[in-house]
């Protein structure tokens, strides 16, 4: 299973040089687990979530493990932000991944994090006081991932959150 990743970091201020983007790579096992998460989400017709384990070297995030969460106590999309925040924290886990299956356009689900997703990401940071890695899967082969605190290969400190 190969995922095309569209990493995203804040745009540089006007006049600044563009910032390099972090790259994301997935182990074979993590890629297979993400594929299973997507297939299970489609079969259930509900979004699904999982914990992510990763390591960071230079400007690359290596996702090494994925552990699906059972879809209980969830919102209308099948995801419990509180549960994923509590179960997917350090030191074993470095963030979360979830699926977007509801169509946003005629052809695709949303390819970006929603406002609710951003709130869950903030809850994760507030709980663990650590930079996180977050992904969403929006097709059998595509995902969008973001990593807090990674700018041009340097691990940044969380400031002004």
Label the predicted regions.
Residues 1-8:
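Bacterial N-terminal signal peptides
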Residues 9-93, 101-161:
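Conserved beta-strand-loop surface patch within small alpha/beta domains used
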